[in-house]
C-alpha cells in the first residue's frame, strides 16, 4: 500500500521535519508513484543536509531528466561522475540528457567512454591493465626481461608466454 506508506512518511516528517532519511525514503516513494516534482523537493532537502549524498544527487538527476530539466540533470550527473568516474550509468544518462539539449559533442564523449568501458570489459582488462601491458611491451622491445619473452612483433606457435599472445605468429 504505497499511499498508506506515503501518509506514514508525511506523519513522521511532521513530527521530525529534519529527518533526512525520511525525506530520502519519501522521495523514493514519491518517484515510484509518479509525483516527480515533490520527489525532487525531498531529494533537494536531503542534498542540502548531506551535500555528498551521491545516491540522492543521482536520483534527483533521473527525476530532473524525467521532468524535462535536462541542464539540471546534466549538472547532477556530472557531480556524481566527478566523484565516481567509473559509474557508467552516470555517463549513459548524461549522454541521453546532452542529446536532448543538442550537445552532440558532449553526448559523443560520454558514449565514447561507455564504448571504451565495454571494450575493456570484453577484453578482460581495465585501463590500468592496458597501461601495464603497454609498459611490458616497451620493456620487451627494449631488450629488458628478455628471458620472459622474445623481442619484436612476432612469436612462435609454441610460445606459452601470455604477454606475447598479441604478437603475430
Where do the language-model regions lie?
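Alpha-helical tetratricopeptide repeat
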Residues: 1-169
Amino acid at each position: 500500500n504505497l499511499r498508506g506508506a506515503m501518509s506514514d512518511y508525511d506523519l513522521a516528517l511532521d513530527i521530525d521535519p529534519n529527518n533526512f532519511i525520511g525525506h530520502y525514503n519519501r522521495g523514493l516513494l514519491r518517484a515510484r508513484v509518479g509525483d516527480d516534482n515533490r520527489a525532487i523537493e525531498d531529494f533537494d532537502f536531503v542534498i542540502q543536509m548531506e551535500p555528498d549524498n551521491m545516491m540522492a544527487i543521482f536520483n534527483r538527476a533521473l527525476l530532473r531528466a524525467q521532468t524535462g530539466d535536462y541542464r539540471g540533470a546534466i549538472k547532477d550527473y556530472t557531480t556524481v561522475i566527478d566523484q565516481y568516474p567509473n559509474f557508467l550509468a552516470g555517463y549513459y544518462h548524461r549522454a541521453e540528457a546532452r542529446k536532448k539539449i543538442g550537445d552532440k559533442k558532449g553526448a559523443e564523449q560520454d558514449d565514447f567512454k561507455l564504448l571504451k568501458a565495454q571494450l575493456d570489459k570484453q577484453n578482460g582488462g581495465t585501463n590500468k591493465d592496458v597501461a601495464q601491458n603497454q609498459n611490458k611491451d616497451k620493456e620487451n622491445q627494449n631488450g629488458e626481461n628478455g628471458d620472459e619473452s622474445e623481442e619484436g612483433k612476432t612469436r612462435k606457435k609454441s610460445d606459452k608466454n601470455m604477454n606475447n599472445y598479441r604478437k603475430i605468429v
